[in-house]
Every structure is written in C-alpha cells, then in structure tokens.
Curated annotation (Swiss-Prot):
Record's protein name: Small ribosomal subunit protein uS15
Key word Ribonucleoprotein present: yes
Protein family (similarity comment): Belongs to the universal ribosomal protein uS15 family.
One GO molecular-function entry: structural constituent of ribosome
SMART domains documented for this protein: Ribosomal_S13_N (SM01386), Ribosomal_S15 (SM01387)
Keyword entries, A-Z: Ribonucleoprotein, Ribosomal protein
Entry-linked CDD domains: Ribosomal_S15p_S13e
Disulphide bond pairs: none
Entries under InterPro entries matching the protein: Ribosomal_uS15, Ribosomal_uS15_arc_euk, Ribosomal_uS15_N, uS15_NS1_RNA-bd_sf
Amino acid sequence: MGAMHSRGKGISSSALPYKRTPPTWLKTAASDVEEMITKAAKKGQMPSQIGVLLRDQHGIPLVKSVTGSKILRILKAHGLAPEIPEDLYFLIKKAVAIRKHLERNRKDKDSKFRLILVESRIHRLARYYKRTKKLPPTWKYESTTASTLVA
C-alpha cells in the first residue's frame, strides 16, 4: 500500500522470516527480553524505538518469536503502553512543528497545504482508533491543544 498523499504505489517492504520460532543462535530468555522492554519503556522510548534497540544492540530479530507476544502487548501488560498510539502521536508532532513554522512564515503556502494533509491523516487515523477502541470515543484532535499532547 502506498503513502496516502503521494503518487507512488509503495510496493517495497521487508520480508519476514517464514519460521516463527526463535533463532537457534539466540540465547536470550523471554523473561530477559520482557525486562529489557520494560526498562526501555520506563526511559521514555516508544515501541518502535524499543524494537530497533533490541535488534541493533541485543541481536533480537523479532520479539514475538522469542516471547510469544508483541512489544505493545508486553507494555500493556506492565501498564507502560502510551495513551496515544505511536503513529498518531508522530503525526500530531509533525502538525505542531508545521504550525510553529507557519507562525514564523505566514506566507508559506506549501506548508499550509501540507498541514491540511497531515491534519486530515490525523482525523482519519483518530476515527479508526476510536472504532477499534484504542482511543476513547470522546477523544478529539484540536490544533490549539495539540502541543500539550506532544510535550
């Protein structure tokens, strides 16, 4: 699936291994991996950053193959999951940065247009997360309070 507001089709993606068992060379236990995940989350890292950290520094290719559950599910079990889903959080962060830019550069028409696209993505994603009950039904994106959500 391609990016929402672009021309490309976006066909390339990484191939997941067929075997869902942990690699034979990996000697880390599931409890140790969960402990690493909770430590990283307490430091304030997002689930995707935790996955990159485990892959690059500890050599754990897939958390699900080792522990049996994904990073976000482990964080929810320990009460460390972010209140706003990660992709929505970063879209809000981008919208806040564009608004800050537009305060300094009022005539930047391209940024105004990009802000409209980003905010439409935010509204669409928020609608999806309300439907799947990952956000409360009363949650609403407002540009005036967005900077407090990201801070």
